[in-house]
């Protein structure tokens, strides 16, 4: 089947795939066509970041679906966000990213809107307009995610 991959520059790439193909396979096909190494690719479908080991079928990606390709810049920092259930989400950030941007990354992976997220690091609640660097958040840092219920303070 054919699927489309749209880049940030607005270019659309057409790929021939099977629904049993993994996201890894799709990234390899994008590398063949565009020369972008898979470790620099992030694929988004229906607002979610696609994980390498999963298949197109797992995400219900069908013929003529459009995926969005976002480039992960070199020098990105991998941090972890731990949820109340104990689940750890790995997120790639830049030191200059605002906390709001970090929350957007959490939303891409978990579907939790940024307004419902409170991020805690080193015992402090993080302000949206500050950067990861402002809080000395580095590779391997673990942030804690607390959900803010509507109407709560």
UniProtKB/Swiss-Prot annotation:
SUPFAM superfamilies: Ubiquitin-like. Signal peptide: none annotated. GO terms for cellular component: cytoplasm; nucleus. Residues 153 form a propeptide. One of its GO terms (molecular function) is mRNA binding. The keyword Manganese does not apply. Induction: By cold and PEG, but not by NaCl. There is a cross-link at residues 48, 63 (Glycyl lysine isopeptide (Lys-Gly) (interchain with G-Cter in ubiquitin)). At 13 degrees Celsius, expressed in roots and to a lower extent in old leaves and crown. When transferred at 4 degrees Celsius, levels increase in leaves and crown but decrease in roots. PANTHER family: UBIQUITIN (PTHR10666). This is Ubiquitin-NEDD8-like protein RUB1. The lineage of its organism: Eukaryota, Viridiplantae, Streptophyta, Embryophyta, Tracheophyta.
